[in-house]
Design a protein with these regions (language model features):
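Short glycine-biased active-site loop of nucleotidyltransferases that positions the nucleotide triphosphate
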Residues: 38-41, 83-88
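N-terminal glycine-rich flavin-associated loop
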Residues: 16, 41-72, 96-121
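Conserved PLP cofactor-binding pocket of PLP-dependent enzymes
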Residues: 75
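Short helix/loop capping segments that flank catalytic or ligand/cofactor-binding pockets
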Residues: 59, 82-83
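A glycine- and small-aliphatic-rich helix-loop capping segment at beta-alpha/alpha-beta transitions
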Residues: 86-100
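N-terminal accessory segments
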Residues: 1-39, 67-70
Length: 121
């Protein structure tokens, strides 16, 4: 990602904070370190991390990113082993960590409905 794209994302931070809340938009270098990798050996440097709490917030972030041609990488718990949650092109990491509720467990039909930040610990 070029410098102009990086600056464009930085300009969007106030709008991202309006969408997700001040505490749920990370752009400090120390905060971003955790989001440079998952369980694989690959690394990438996001410009900003957004931690939405609702599907509406996700939709708003994606619309904003799309209208500004900014790459977005979705991240569940960051435990993947294939590098799928790595921001190789910079951009925005959309962390689903706050969306960690088990919504339904149907034992008879053997399925569960969970949010993307649920971990199996």
């Amino acid at each position: 990602m070029g410098k102009s794209q990086h600056l464009k994302i930085k300009d969007l931070i106030p709008e991202l904070k309006r969408i997700a809340g001040d505490n749920y938009v990370l752009d400090d270098q120390a905060d971003l370190l955790v989001y440079e990798y998952d369980g694989s050996i690959d690394r990438g440097n996001p410009v900003v991390v957004v931690l939405p709490n609702t599907t509406k917030e996700i939709s708003q972030v994606l619309k904003l990113a799309r209208s500004n041609s900014i790459p977005v990488v979705a991240r569940g718990a960051g435990t993947g082993l294939s590098g799928g949650a790595i921001a190789e092109q910079g951009g925005i990491v959309l962390s689903m960590a706050r969306m960690n509720q088990i919504l339904e467990v149907n034992r008879s039909d053997r399925y569960a409905i969970v949010e993307p930040g649920v971990v199996n610990l």
